Design a protein with these regions (language model features):
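Glycine-rich phosphate-binding loop of ATP-grasp-fold ATP-dependent ligases
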Residues: 72, 84-86, 108-133, 155
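C-terminal active-site "lid" helix and adjoining low-complexity regulatory extension at the edge
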Residues: 3, 200, 214-215, 227-273
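Conserved N-proximal alpha/beta basic substrate-recognition cap immediately N-terminal to
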Residues: 1-85
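Rossmann-like NAD(P)H-binding beta-loop-alpha module
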Residues: 84-107
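Phosphate-binding site of ATP-dependent enzymes
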Residues: 122-216
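Protein kinase-like catalytic core scaffold
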Residues: 108, 165-167, 221, 233-236
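A short glycine-rich, hydrophobically flanked beta-strand micro-motif that places a catalytic Asp/Glu
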Residues: 15-18, 147, 218-229
Length: 273
């Protein structure tokens, strides 16, 4: 789909699964469609592309910021992005647990600073579970993000490109599970979805998505938002959001891919390629 869209806006696109730094120099633009991480070849490739002056999405700044919940939390507070009440903890004493419960109530959501796609994310229903889970998580990370729990039937996922919303989905929770992804054991399941035009999305949801994306950069992001009544809460900003045939493209179809490829064309033009 992306290859056809690239042709339509006037350039040839190759799908590559591996790319050496020499080969990278033959291209004008790089679009990473693999889950990114900091200590990972995707980040190294993005950095190499930037050094070569190649237009790249996701850029290294976006990868660093999206993979870092400490940064996102601070940026949201500073830019006044509506988000769930949250704090970072570095110990799991009774005192810490009691204060968390007093401040945020129960259940609580616990996240590793570098978690994504519902992995490394846990829910604690009571003090014992909170203490046990915190101890376990602090064994692998110096900090754990603790958030108030907000129940909703679905999460909004707003795709934002260059500061503008381009697609909107509702991802529903997995049956009998509190997240949109369930990684129980070896089985992986995800809930249902609904895709709609961005003009049908409530205004506060779109505004929050644009504001949250701006705190990260001007690339392509998937912003996850919960809405209860008139209140909206940004849960996180994902670089490299999934764009699956029949899901995110269900409303716009081919146009979604063309919009993204056009962004590359525009950026190349700005650089005089």
């Amino acid at each position: 789909n992306f290859v056809k869209a690239a042709e339509k806006v006037g350039f040839r696109a190759d799908v590559v699964s591996r790319l050496s730094q020499e080969e990278l120099g033959h291209y004008d633009a790089l679009f990473i469609r693999e889950t990114t991480a900091i200590d990972h070849h995707t980040y190294r490739l993005a950095r190499a592309a930037e050094r070569e002056g190649i237009v790249v999405m996701d850029d290294t700044q976006s990868i660093l910021r999206c993979c870092n919940k400490v940064y996102l939390q601070d940026a949201f507070a500073y830019q006044k992005v509506p988000a769930p009440k949250a704090t970072f903890v570095s110990s799991a004493t009774d005192e810490v647990c009691e204060k968390l419960i007093a401040d945020f109530g129960l259940p609580l959501v616990l996240k590793l600073p570098e978690s994504s796609f519902s992995r490394g994310v846990h829910k604690a229903e009571n003090k014992e579970a909170l203490k046990a889970r915190l101890e376990q998580m602090l064994a692998e990370s110096a900090l754990v993000l603790v958030q108030e729990y907000i129940f909703t039937e679905f999460d909004w996922r707003i795709g934002v490109l260059g500061g503008k919303p381009i697609y909107a989905c509702q991802y529903f929770m997995v049956r009998n599970h509190w997240q949109i992804y369930n990684h129980q054991g070896d089985r992986f399941s995800s809930g249902g979805f609904a895709t709609m035009p961005t003009f049908e999305v409530p205004k506060p949801v779109l505004q929050a998505a644009i504001k949250a994306a701006k705190a990260v950069g001007d690339g392509l992001y998937g912003v996850d938002i919960k809405q209860t009544g008139n209140a909206v809460y940004v849960i996180e900003v994902n670089d490299n959001p999934s764009i699956d045939s029949g899901v995110e493209d269900k409303y716009l179809g081919k146009e979604l891919y063309e919009l993204i490829m056009q962004e590359f064309a525009d950026r190349l033009e700005q650089r005089g390629r």
